[in-house]
Amino acid sequence: MPSIQESKLAFIGGGNMASAIIGGLLSKGVNKQNICVSEPWDVNREKIAALGVRTTTSNVEAGGDADLVIIAVKPQVTKGVCQELGGAWSPRATLPVVVSIAAGITLDSLKEWLTTSDSRTAHTVRVMPNTPALVGEGASGAFASTDITSDEKELVNAMLGSVSKATEWVDREDLLDVVTGLSGSGPAYFFAMVEHLVASATALGLPEDQATRLATQTCLGAGKMMVESSDSPSQLRKNVTSPNGTTYAALQTFESLNFKEIVNKSVQAATARSAELGNPSTKP
């Protein structure tokens, strides 16, 4: 299996997440001419072309001879894209590795749709990235078919590592729903927290722009402390909580309003909804 620098990479879909990954790959030294992107929309295709990579409107042209194919299209068009690619790969001696970031599409469905005319199926990986990947600070969950090799897994890790600081491989596909509830939807939880912190401080008289800068940097700084410290988040919380101090007063309010249960139910709701979206019988 060639390295990420030597591999031919195809992106089917050139939206924001694909653009972020491509930018990350280029920053890691991947040759622009080794990347081809299929994108039907002129505006998106022009933005991608500005990065110096090859572009096309043909999925087969982009992915026909690629080593790694990233499917980054909307779930409702994923089946057609996969069937088109599977048909084009029938003459190939070796099939590519396929990574899907299409939400709610199961591995079994992907492998069925990607099956070639001679009944072979590409080794396939499902990935749940999150939006901080757009600034190179993503967190991704991944689940692979049992036939994936260690070299293929390393290739996927290298691709995801260009935009994700954390990539976690789960042992069961249903755990991707939990990943969705945790890190996939997670950025919105922090946005909401900062939103409400700013509103509270503004109501107490602090100018909104100052409150926004302070709250945003506090969120960023706390995250960096968790990344760089050997202490658990629980211990870090205890470290900054003096008995009967200001932080203690705030956290006591959290406890009295059952903040823990709010978080539990929120993650459970997102996880359950992710599972529903992955079940064709429950999709709206």
Task: Mark where each language-model region is.
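Internal alpha-helical scaffold of NAD(P)-dependent oxidoreductase catalytic cores
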Residues: E112-H123, A139-V178, F191-E228, R273
